């Protein structure tokens, strides 16, 4: 997958990383990107797609790691890889080159669909603008980059002086929708699901929910009949001042908020992989009510090396009668990595009974049940250990006497990380 650190790349990762049929690799040209915190198999140091050596560098990675398919995760990359498919050592997952070329240009998209769908009015010059505000948009681009809503001619002239290639188009004030689609290798539109874009941040939809309506299915069929798609794609429409749905853009790739339909059972990235393998697929979507709200997610990387974890029970692993599921996730990560778990507690009741009620009785390699007044620090025997406790006093005592890292429950999130090797260039 390339570039693996984009929002699109991260959605592809979430779509494919748990499938047992797929070994997933992420690659990037940018040293600082979120992909390096996520991918178990991560490769950096690729040239940019504009570099003459990009294809050779990509082919080296493909051959070195036995890559079968390349999944593009950005519009510009999508077009570049489609243009260079014959020179690449593996197959690119995506639609044919001509479709990619049309979809990567708003002007070309509008020219193709103007005879059959409503598209935004384009103004060849500012003299032809009938009313303000208008939109200025790059011909190519995604996620709202370089888009300006301009209320006056003076402001429009300011932006056009900086970038004469911007398209001047009508402002559409209504609701906005994305329709997530999948077309199989036979050209059949197998799924089209609409979702309303309820909140936009930096051009990305961060709050969305599914919507029904035959009009969205009709639009999807019309677009699918005009362009040749293969695999995942989507299009966006927005209501005009009269409520008319107007085609904004089409993209033959994964969208970040496709996670909404993925959680209803439609995994667009996985469907596209199987379709690229010339496999027939079946789609079974759930119909319960759902909405998605996205926010920045933190991932951490530390230099900690440990073979033992000591953890407190009361108000730490179990709080107010409820299991701390975030902490349990970390403890099971330790189990997967062969780290030994020690429960260290002054619990006043039967520890076995409490763990049994919480269904945690077989989780720990050792249970140390201290009496009142006994110091937890004296029970910790290893130097390659961590200590987790809600009590600052307990953490301070352990840190000062044992010199090991100590964590409050809220800080355990920094310990949740992919067990990945060092990045390979």
Q: Model-derived features: where do they sit?
A:
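ATP-dependent carboxylate/phosphate-activation module, predominantly the ATP-grasp catalytic core
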Residues: 169-228, 239, 251-277
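Non-catalytic pre-domain segments flanking phosphatase-related domains
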Residues: 246, 254-311
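Conserved Lys-Pro-Asp/Glu-containing loop-to-beta segment of HAD-superfamily phosphomonoesterases
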Residues: 375-393, 398
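Acidic di-acidic motifs
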Residues: 4, 312-314, 387-391
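Active-site nucleotide/adenylate-binding loops and adjacent lid/helix of ATP-dependent enzymes
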Residues: 99-174, 185-188, 214
């Amino acid at each position: 997958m390339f570039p693996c650190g984009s929002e699109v790349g991260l959605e592809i990762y979430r779509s494919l990383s748990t499938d047992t049929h797929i070994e997933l690799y992420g690659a990037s040209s940018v040293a600082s990107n979120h992909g390096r915190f996520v991918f178990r198999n991560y490769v950096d140091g690729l040239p940019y797609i504009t570099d003459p050596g990009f294809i050779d560098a990509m082919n080296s990675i493909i051959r070195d790691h036995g890559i079968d398919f390349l999944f593009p995760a950005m519009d510009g990359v999508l077009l570049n890889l489609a243009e260079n498919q014959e020179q690449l050592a593996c197959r690119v997952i995506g639609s044919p080159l001509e479709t990619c070329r049309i979809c990567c240009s708003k002007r070309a998209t509008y020219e193709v669909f103007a005879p059959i769908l409503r598209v935004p009015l384009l103004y060849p010059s500012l003299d032809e603008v009938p009313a303000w505000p208008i939109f200025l948009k790059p011909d190519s681009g995604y996620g709202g980059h370089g888009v300006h809503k301009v209320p006056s001619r003076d402001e429009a002239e300011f932006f056009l002086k900086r970038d004469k290639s911007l398209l001047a188009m009508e402002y559409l004030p209504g609701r906005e929708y994305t329709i997530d689609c999948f077309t199989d290798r036979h050209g059949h539109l197998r799924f089209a699901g609409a979702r309303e874009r309820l909140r936009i941040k930096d051009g990305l939809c961060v709050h969305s929910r599914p919507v029904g309506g035959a009009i969205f299915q009709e639009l999807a069929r019309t677009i699918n009949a005009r362009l040749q798609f293969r695999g995942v794609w989507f299009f966006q429409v927005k209501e005009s001042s009269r409520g008319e749905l107007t085609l904004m853009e089409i993209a033959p790739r994964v969208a970040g908020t496709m996670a909404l339909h993925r959680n209803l059972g439609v995994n667009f990235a996985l469907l596209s992989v199987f379709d690229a393998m010339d496999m027939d697929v079946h789609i079974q979507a759930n119909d319960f009510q759902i909405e998605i709200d996205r926010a920045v997610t933190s991932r951490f990387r530390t230099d900690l090396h440990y073979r033992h974890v000591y953890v407190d029970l009361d108000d730490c692993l179990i709080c107010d009668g409820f299991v701390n599921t975030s902490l349990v996730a970390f403890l099971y990560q330790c189990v997967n990595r062969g780290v030994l778990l020690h429960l260290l507690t002054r619990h006043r009741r039967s520890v076995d009974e409490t763990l049994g009620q919480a269904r945690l009785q077989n989780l720990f390699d050792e249970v140390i049940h201290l009496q009142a007044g006994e110091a937890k620090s004296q029970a910790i025997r290893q130097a390659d250990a961590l200590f987790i406790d809600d009590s600052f006093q307990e953490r301070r005592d352990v840190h000062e006497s044992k010199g090991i890292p100590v964590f409050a429950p809220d800080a355990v999130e920094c310990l949740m990380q992919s067990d990945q090797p060092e990045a390979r260039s």
